[in-house]
Amino acid sequence: MIKVYNTLNKKKEEFIPLTPGEVKMYVCGPTVYNFFHIGNGRTFIVFDTIRRYFEYRGFKVDFVQNFTDIDDKMIKKANEEGTTVKKIGDTYIKEYYQDADALNIERATVNPRATEFIGEIIKFVKGLVDKGYAYEVDGDVYFSTKKFEGYGKLSGQNIEDLQSGARISVDERKKDPMDFAIWKAQKPGEPAWNSPWGMGRPGWHIECSCMAKKLLGETIDIHAGGSDLKFPHHENEIAQSEALTGEPFARYWLHSAFVNVNNEKMSKSLNNFFTAREILERYDADVIRFLMLSAHYRQQLNFSEDLLESAKASVERIYNAIGNLENLIDEVSREEMNEEEKAYLESLNKYKEKYIEKMDDDFNTADAITAIFDLIKDTNTNITIDSSKELAQKALELIRELGAPLGMFQKSTKGNLEEEIEALIAKRQQARKDRDFALADKIRDELKDRGIVLEDTPQGVRWKMI
């Protein structure tokens, strides 16, 4: 049984899909006017992992993640660069895929662009106007929040409190300060489409509501995104979607926490961000994913070079174990397991059970990773040159099986690990000859930190995993 923390009801709930064995999941994607930063990247990695885990548990997942390709920021960027909004969108959608692929983020079932749904959006807006939930002023169309009972139920705020909130724009033409634009009249220099209210473009909130409804249906299983989208974006999506259809919009709402730098939220507006591409130039995707999944997805994560280095060392420990098993598979002479080994292999299932228990509990990736470390500690100790090829192979398959939903630990180290260690040993031997004992000790300690111990023997230096 999978339990998820439902932001809507402020508690963990058993996940029961609308259709048995299927998950309809919508995740708010990027506004494509720039490269995405690692704070956005955490959101994409988290929900990629959750999608993978549902699939691991046997669900068929329809996973939709949109591109916002018409927006104030995109218009500003296009005007600054003397190009069109479409060209800006085309460019940064391509760049998104490059970076997301590099982070081993699986492609969505569908990545809709808002501009591909203008006709559907106009129908959606007209439906709200016809039902009395929206009104037109000078070519702009606003959603009337007071008409929708329960506005504020996601963010847990009442409408009176929200009216004085700092994020609400003041416009005297609106009937209420809380009302928000679902269609915007054209301004000079802006792209626009013909509508019953004149030339204009959609508001941001209406885009996701429309795409989710069109691609997944009136009620979906999971709507997800960063916690900064809870209000007003997701609150407004609920209001306009449920006002139009009369049905619950999403049964479960999942939100990932911020990535912070110096205890401040990472954001482009604060100029304290690092793009995913910048980090990928220096660290492997497994390292970045490890860091992003090393804390529970609802827990804020501080981003620093030290934490990246720590994640790198942790990933290396796991790949050292993988490399050790790969080498044993090549080196051991006995093919099949004996009865004792079969019993030992069966005992390793306790780590898989612990992993599933933790992931079933609102996708606790941090504790699931701990289960993988416990597994490799066991295999490093008990699978040796005297073991069978079959046992080493089965243990390796189990490590990879548990790593797959996390999007990690799938690469082969064959040849690379041994060559790297032998090169470091040779460097250490030369340092000792040169009487540079500080360097020799540093190399020994570095190898030890990676789970490799050196033994000086009459035949030379040997190494083994611990």
From Swiss-Prot:
GO terms of molecular function: ATP binding; cysteine-tRNA ligase activity; zinc ion binding
Subcellular location: Cytoplasm
Keywords of this entry: Aminoacyl-tRNA synthetase, ATP-binding, Cytoplasm, Ligase, Metal-binding, Nucleotide-binding, Protein biosynthesis, Zinc
Matching Gene3D superfamilies: Cysteine-tRNA ligase, C-terminal anti-codon recognition domain (1.20.120.1910), HUPs (3.40.50.620)
Motif ('HIGH' region): 30-40
Annotated catalysed reactions: tRNA(Cys) + L-cysteine + ATP = L-cysteinyl-tRNA(Cys) + AMP + diphosphate
Annotated residues for binding of ATP: 268
SMART domains named among the record's database cross-references: DALR_2
Motif ('KMSKS' region): 265-269
Family: Belongs to the class-I aminoacyl-tRNA synthetase family.
Protein's name in the database: Cysteine--tRNA ligase
Native source species: Clostridium perfringens (strain 13 / Type A)
